């Protein structure tokens, strides 16, 4: 994974309003079929990671486990998960994996 490019795209998603943060928001986005990619920080707890992965498996949403701390470093927002709305930005992020 090209971390430098991924960080840039993550920041762009936030500025463009294409990112959803928080457990409830991410779960709603994935369950509602609005999420093109779910990014999980490497510091996420094992139980939370499993819950997100099970939900994404049921809905067919791609999940990526990032390096610890990368999510906050790239977006400036603390948290364990970021849902990227479906569209060209999520497709670009998938292409750099």
Sequence positions of predicted segments:
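Generic secondary-structure boundary/loop-capping signal
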Residues: 7, 16, 41, 68, ...
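Structural motif
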Residues: 36-37, 62-64, 79-82
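C-terminal structural segments of small proteins and small subunits
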Residues: 70-97
